[in-house]
Amino acid sequence: YKRQDQYHPMTDVIHKVLNDITVDDWAIIIGGDSHTRMSKGVAFGADSGTVALALATGEATMPVPESVKVTFTGSMADHMDFRDVVHATQSQMLKQFGDNVFQGRVIEVHIGTLLADQAFTFTDWTAEMKAKASICISEDATLIESLEIAKHRIQIMIDKGMENDDLMLHRLIGMAEKRIAQIRSGEKPALAPDANARYAAEVVVDLDLIDEPMIA
C-alpha cells in the first residue's frame, strides 16, 4: 500500500494510459497482457518473450489471425448503457453460431461513430471472449474527435510533470496533429478494410433486441 500522493495524477491502469496516448489508427501494438487493447490501431496481448524481443529489436513475429466482422442494426434505447451493447454482442453471437467464433481471432467492430472511450470499452472486453485482438473501424470525423481527446489528455499529463527527457508526450501530440491533418486533407483516411476483405464469420447485433440492462 502506498499513499495516494506518491503517484502522479493521471497515473492509471496501464491499458487505460496506453489507450489515452495511442494516436495512430494504423499502428500494430503488442503488450505483455491479454488486455492490451486500444481504441485506435490493432493491439495484441503477447508473451513476455515476444514483448522483450520487440523492445530489443523493434520486431516481433506472430501468426496472422483470421478476422470476424461485427456490424449492428437498430438503435440504442435511452435506458441502455454501452456496456449493454458489449454484453449483447456476446449473447447474440453465441445464439447465431452456437460457439465462440471470436476465440483466437481479430474482432473488427463496425460502429464508425464510437469515440475513444466507448471503442476502448468494446476492444478491452474482447479479451474476455478470448479474441486475439480487436479493432474499431472509425469514420474520419470520429477519429479526428478521438485524436483531439487524446491530445487533451496527453497535455494534462505534460502539465502534471509527467514528460520525460526525450519529450515523448510532446512528440505524441505532434503525431496526433499530423494524423488529423492527413485525415482532413484526404491524404490518409481512417483505417478501413479492403472492399474484398474476407472474414471467418460475420456477426450482426440487433440493438432493438436489448430491452433491459445486461450484466456479465
Language-model-detected regions and their locations in the chain:
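Fe-S-dependent hydro-lyases/dehydratases of central metabolism
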Residues: 2-216
